[in-house]
């Protein structure tokens, strides 16, 4: 085929036949056109004349349908020749114009032709097609044309997914504008296309939020909630332009929200994401949308802390984006722009005298070259594959290769080199060798760090609490770490802290069997290796103690034949026997393991390498924890409790009336037995003990011995089956459960500040309202029917309302029901008037109405001025005493906190009411070495009593003096100093608080200053001065002295 006279005649005939073709022979003629045009081309010729005529025919109403049919056939995916492709793409604007035609036949043919073109072009030539589509979408007023364009973009995503991902920066704005179109059809099509386009955002961290992000574009009212959701997201995958292009609309709107917390959270996310970006060109296209919002917020936000956070985000964005002085935005790189590559190509072709008719092919090549540059494809062979067929349209093969290679070299000179790994000199099979970044919502944890793991090695993962140890382990298990092998290549099993409560009634055997890890016989055999007997294998999981539950989770993980075992605090809830068994198993099993543990002895015994968090990198050290301390002295706090500079403080407990020394018992239990309903024997039997403000008690014993049950009875969570439990009327007990997260698991979408406000908003601790010692049961209801003889009338107590001092005890104001016809069928009890209320001594009332008395005691204690104002500042200051900064307390949802941070929150909330007795069940779980040392110091200095259940002898050896050994339901105390009265020691005096006091409604209580009583000599002197002054002034004298009246 050539542009010779003969070819021109053939093309003219085909065009003429096409213009007069009928619907019956249209396809036949169009097929002939396609065959001729796509046929073998004579070297250095192009069908320019034909396509110019075809463009005119498309615009002609009479021949448009036939011409568009010809385009559809020419652009068939099986037959489009490289020599024709540039000229077909040049027809796209004319085709787009006809998609909005009022003639339905023309419109239908144009839609078909457009779809044929976008699905037939070379994927790397997307820069030649997409600008036509986005320009039409932005400029046209025809809704049918917009719908056609949106459909074409969706088809282009399927055709060139990776190439479209690089164009998301320019695509998202025009699609967003189409989503706001007033025409319903356009709006729906735009939403569908946006959803399709976001399939190119291959970022596992945000892919589940993409529907929400799209919804935010159409419905701005969803922005605040989505900002909160993203605040608790772990960013692990590389942050690409495609990721930023879908995030920027949300963040720019978040910065413009009215609520300061949303503005603040948006600034934090911007700060966090920018830290993961090393190339300024990645953020450059988004600076004009994010920078002004941050600058404006910094100047108008009133909250100083929020302004500081905004400034931090602003500084990071300026630094990463290479923003110049005076906030001059940097120039965006144009290395991949078709205009730039066209300039390079034109300079190389200047001496070749390329005919004008080949100009479409030259421009097409520049678009392909621009895309290859954007994709960072620099190898010669790929360029030859994608570009050479188009260059041979106007050059000989050898000449085309020579010029193309020079074009490639000149065009890719500014592409940065990819990152290189520093290979370790270490023998053995690699299971993983990758570089990645890790963030958790608003906090950057790791940035472009390397992780290399060998088969059969045992690694300890060490770092401060909140540094991201558990987050990294979970990200590995969920396949969210870039470059980490998939589960098919390398089976990785994550052992959870605890087994999900939904399996409570599932038997041990069935729970493991559900994991598809083998036959029940094989599972039973393996469970027995872990210490389970036949009876335990069939019992429900709920019946297992915490230690056995952890062993079950470990057994299940081992049965999955893991290549890598991820163990997060595996010694939690395990006694020393089970820890020794686990140590031996990990050393002998030959499975690669990564262990996070706060048990320094355990890490010393099992680790061959320590992976240590240093800055935002992971660094590997050969040896165990002791070896790490020798090389990194700052890691000493992981090894020795108390070596850290971190400090905790517990609030000073309030004054207890009648307690003159720290030795006096404030809790006393006598001959107490407890048995769960339906069990064959008591869990604890015949236990007696007492606690005082000076108590420092360690409760020890094997798993399942009854330690937690004993404490539950002491704190009122359970009622004893037999025996007596006395607690001081005004005592406040802080109880942190073994599974500390139970306190907060239903409040994960609150901030820590909001949780504390919810918990104490009534003045009482809402977490304790459902305790057994506050619930009225049948026995209580029966006892409350007791009849009192008052003023000669039979009465029952209807309510207890207040309390006052009475001798060495108290008496209570009671309202009554008056009995009539007692013992008869017509017996009834009539409410009496408030004027008939009477005061009864505590001893008389407590026998039958003990729980009602306890309620009044609690309210009186709160009304005595020991209530704290639930302000943000007060809560932040209290939480700071337990190592939580204001950022986490007021601006991060509980769901986004690390395990250690959640435990600190539980400690802070539990001690909010300034308790007299702190009860900790397994406090070493989930806290890092720094926090454990700080907790140990704080408990030593605490002015109240402390009871600790723990398996960690290291934690309690310097802290506790008294030991309660629990075994088989029996408790044996040692080291105790129980006294029957006040005991010896310094006398306690009631302190007048220097701080402001508040009542239960938050009102400030102003306590008047007591006047000092004057002596008789001072009174005489004062009287003389007064009389002298009166004599001098006469009638003008006015006294303000009380003594004159």
UniProtKB/Swiss-Prot annotation:
By sequence similarity, the record places it as follows:
Belongs to the ABC transporter superfamily. ABCF family. EF3 subfamily.
Q: Where is this region: Disordered?
A: 975-1045
The protein depicted here goes by the name: Elongation factor 3
Which top-level group of life is the source organism from? Eukaryota
Q: Name one Pfam family in it.
A: HEAT_EF3_N
Q: Which CDD domains match?
A: ABCF_EF-3 (cd03221), CD_eEF3 (cd18626)
Q: Name one GO biological process term.
A: cytoplasmic translational elongation
The organism encoding this protein is Zygosaccharomyces rouxii (strain ATCC 2623 / CBS 732 / NBRC 1130 / NCYC 568 / NRRL Y-229)
- ABC transporter domain spans which residues? 426-641, 667-993
* Biological function: Ribosome-dependent ATPase that functions in cytoplasmic translation elongation. Required for the ATP-dependent release of deacylated tRNA from the ribosomal E-site during protein biosynthesis. Stimulates the eEF1A-dependent binding of aminoacyl-tRNA to the ribosomal A-site, which has reduced affinity for tRNA as long as the E-site is occupied. Assists translation termination by stimulating the release of nascent protein from the ribosome by release factors.
Q: Where in the cell is it found?
A: Cytoplasm, Cytosol
| Chief localisation class | cytoplasm
């Amino acid at each position: 085929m050539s542009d010779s006279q003969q070819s021109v005649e053939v093309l003219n005939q085909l065009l003429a036949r096409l213009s007069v073709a009928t619907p019956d022979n249209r396809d036949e003629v169009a097929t002939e056109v396609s065959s001729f045009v796509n046929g073998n081309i004579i070297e250095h010729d192009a069908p320019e004349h034909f396509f110019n005529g075809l463009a005119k025919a498309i615009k002609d109403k009479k021949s448009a349908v036939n011409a568009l049919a010809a385009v559809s056939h020419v652009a068939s995916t099986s037959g489009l020749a490289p020599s024709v492709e540039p000229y077909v793409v040049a027809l796209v604007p004319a085709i787009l114009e006809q998609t909005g035609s009022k003639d339905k036949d023309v419109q239908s043919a144009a839609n078909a032709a457009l779809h044929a073109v976008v699905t037939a072009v070379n994927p790397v030539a997307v820069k030649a097609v997409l600008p036509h589509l986005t320009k039409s979408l932005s400029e046209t007023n025809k809704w049918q044309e917009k719908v056609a364009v949106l459909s074409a973009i969706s088809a282009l995503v399927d055709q060139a997914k990776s190439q479209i991902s690089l164009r998301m920066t320019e695509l998202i704005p025009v699609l967003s504008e189409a989503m706001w179109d007033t025409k319903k059809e356009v709006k729906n099509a735009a939403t569908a296309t946006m959803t399709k386009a976001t399939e190119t955002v291959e970022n596992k961290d945000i892919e589940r939020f993409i529907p929400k992000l799209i919804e935010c574009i159409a419905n701005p009212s969803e922005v605040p909630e989505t900002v909160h959701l993203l605040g608790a997201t772990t960013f692990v995958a590389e942050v690409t332009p495609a990721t930023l292009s879908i995030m920027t609309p949300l963040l720019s709107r978040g910065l413009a929200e009215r609520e300061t917390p949303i503005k603040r959270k948006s600034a934090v996310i911007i700060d966090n994401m920018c830290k993961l970006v090393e190339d300024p060109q990645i953020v450059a296209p988004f600076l004009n949308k994010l920078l002004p919002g941050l600058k404006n917020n910094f100047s108008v936000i009133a909250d100083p802390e929020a302004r500081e956070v905004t400034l931090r985000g602003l500084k990071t964005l300026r630094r990463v984006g290479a923003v110049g002085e005076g906030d001059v935005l940097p120039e965006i790189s144009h290395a991949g722009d078709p205009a730039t590559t066209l300039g390079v190509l034109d300079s190389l072709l200047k001496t070749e005298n390329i005919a004008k008719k080949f100009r479409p092919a030259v421009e097409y090549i520049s678009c392909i070259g621009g895309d290859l540059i954007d994709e960072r494809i620099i190898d010669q062979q790929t360029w030859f594959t994608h570009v050479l067929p188009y260059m041979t349209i106007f050059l000989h093969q050898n000449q085309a290769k020579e010029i193309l290679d020079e074009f490639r070299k000149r065009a890719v000179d500014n592409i940065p080199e990819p990152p290189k790994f520093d290979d370790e000199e270490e023998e053995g099979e690699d299971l993983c060798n990758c570089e990645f970044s890790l963030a958790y919502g608003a906090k950057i944890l790791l940035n472009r760090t390397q992780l290399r793991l060998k088969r059969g090695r045992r690694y300890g993962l060490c770092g401060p609490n909140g540094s991201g140890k558990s987050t990294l382990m979970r990200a590995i298990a969920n396949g969210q770490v870039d470059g980490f092998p998939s589960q098919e290549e390398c089976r990785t099993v994550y052992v959870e802290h605890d087994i999900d409560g939904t399996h409570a009634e599932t038997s041990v055997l069935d729970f493991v069997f559900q994991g598809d890890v083998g036959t029940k016989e094989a599972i039973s055999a393996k469970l027995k290796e872990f210490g389970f007997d036949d009876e335990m294998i069939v019992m429900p999981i709920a019946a297992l103690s915490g230690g056995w539950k952890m062993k079950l989770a470990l057994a299940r993980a081992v049965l999955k034949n893991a290549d890598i075992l991820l163990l997060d605090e595996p010694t939690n809830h395990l006694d020393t026997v089970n820890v020794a068994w686990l140590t031996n198993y990990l050393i002998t099993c030959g499975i690669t393991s990564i262990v996070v543990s706060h048990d320094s002895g355990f890490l010393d015994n099992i680790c061959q390498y320590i992976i240590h968090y240093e800055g935002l990198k992971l660094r590997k050290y050969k040896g165990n924890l002791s070896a790490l301390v020798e090389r990194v002295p700052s890691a000493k706090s992981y090894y020795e409790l108390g070596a850290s500079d971190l400090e905790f403080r517990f609030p000073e407990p309030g004054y207890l009336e009648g307690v003159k020394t720290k030795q006096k018992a404030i809790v006393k239990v006598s001959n107490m037995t407890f048995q769960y309903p339906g069990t064959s024997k008591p869990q604890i039997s015949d236990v007696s003990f007492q606690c005082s403000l000076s108590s420092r008690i360690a409760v020890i014993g094997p798993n399942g011995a009854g330690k937690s049950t004993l404490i539950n009875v002491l704190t009122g969570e359970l009622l004893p089956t037999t025996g007596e439990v006395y607690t001081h009327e005004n005592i406040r007990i802080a109880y942190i459960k073994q599974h500390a997260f139970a306190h907060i698991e239903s409040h994960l979408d609150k901030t820590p500040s909001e949780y504390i406000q919810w918990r104490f908003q009534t003045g009482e601790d809402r977490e304790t309202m459902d305790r057994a010692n506050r619930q009225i049961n049948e026995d209580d209801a029966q006892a409350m029917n007791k009849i009192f003889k008052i003023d000669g009338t039979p009465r029952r107590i209807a309510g207890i309302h207040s309390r006052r001092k009475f001798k060495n005890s108290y008496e209570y104001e009671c309202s009554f029901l008056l009995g009539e016809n007692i013992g008869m069928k017509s017996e009834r009890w009539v409410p009496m008037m408030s004027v008939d209320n009477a005061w009864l001594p505590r001893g008389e009332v407590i026998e039958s109405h003990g729980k009602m008395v306890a309620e009044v005691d609690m309210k009186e204690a709160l009304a005595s001025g020991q209530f704290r104002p639930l302000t943000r500042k007060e809560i932040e200051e209290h939480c700071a005493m337990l190592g939580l900064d204001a950022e986490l307390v007021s601006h991060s949802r509980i769901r986004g906190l690390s395990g250690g941070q959640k435990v600190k929150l539980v400690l802070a909330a539990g001690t909010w009411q300034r308790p007299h007795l702190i009860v900790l069940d397994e406090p070493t779980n989930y806290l890092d070495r720094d926090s454990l040392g700080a907790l140990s110091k704080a408990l030593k200095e605490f002015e109240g009593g402390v009871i600790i259940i723990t398996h960690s002898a290291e934690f309690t050896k310097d802290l506790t003096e008294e030991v309660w050994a629990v075994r088989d339901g029996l408790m044996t105390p040692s080291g105790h100093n129980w006294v029957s009265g006040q005991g010896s020691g310094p006398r306690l005096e009631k302190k007048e608080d220097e701080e402001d006091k508040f009542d239960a409604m938050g009102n400030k209580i102003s306590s008047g200053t007591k006047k000092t009583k004057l002596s008789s000599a001072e009174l005489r002197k004062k009287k003389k001065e007064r009389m002298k002054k009166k004599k001098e002034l006469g009638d003008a004298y006015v006294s303000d002295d009380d003594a004159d009246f």
